[in-house]
Swiss-Prot record:
Stored PANTHER family: COMPLEX III ASSEMBLY FACTOR LYRM7
Entry keyword annotation includes Manganese: no
Protein name: Mitochondrial zinc maintenance protein 1, mitochondrial
Highest taxon of source: Eukaryota
Keyword Mitochondrion found: yes
Function per UniProt: Assembly factor required for Rieske Fe-S protein RIP1 incorporation into the cytochrome b-c1 (CIII) complex. Functions as a chaperone, binding to this subunit within the mitochondrial matrix and stabilizing it prior to its translocation and insertion into the late CIII dimeric intermediate within the mitochondrial inner membrane. Modulates the mitochondrial matrix zinc pool.
Family to which the UniProt record says this protein belongs: Belongs to the complex I LYR family. MZM1 subfamily.
Keywords: Chaperone, Mitochondrion, Transit peptide
Main localization (coarse): mitochondrion
Coiled coil ranges: none
Biological processes per GO annotation: mitochondrial respiratory chain complex III assembly
An example Gene Ontology CC term for this record: mitochondrial matrix
């Protein structure tokens, strides 16, 4: 993947995540642009380029699937959940106060 593709993916992800919030979207655009501008003069064979592009793609994926904005509407908040928002099944929440084993012999939350 090229830096240009990663840049575009990141800008689109910011637009999806922060749609309707001009101040936050502008700040995200400026931060993304600044980060890419700082590295624009690196030689094509620089070993730091590939990890930086991978990081940009990971951030874009995170923004699309894990950032949800809420707006206060009276005494409640309305969440703007979109088609890319990751929705978990909350299986561990449904178990309640039981001891949950994750991966090994240790109990969850030092229980």
């Amino acid at each position: 993947m090229s830096a240009l593709h990663a840049y575009r993916h990141l800008m689109r992800a910011a637009r999806v995540a922060f749609d309707g919030d001009a101040r936050t979207l502008t700040a995200a655009y400026e931060s993304i642009s600044r980060g890419f501008r700082e590295n624009q003069n690196l030689p094509a064979n620089d070993p730091t380029i590939a990890p930086a592009i991978a990081h940009a793609e990971e951030v874009a994926s995170f923004l699309r699937s894990n950032v949800v904005q809420g707006r206060k509407d009276g005494e409640t908040y309305k969440l703007r959940i979109h088609k890319d928002t990751e929705r978990g099944d909350n299986d561990t929440i449904k178990l309640g106060n039981q001891n949950i084993k994750i991966g090994g012999e240790h109990k969850c939350c030092s229980a």
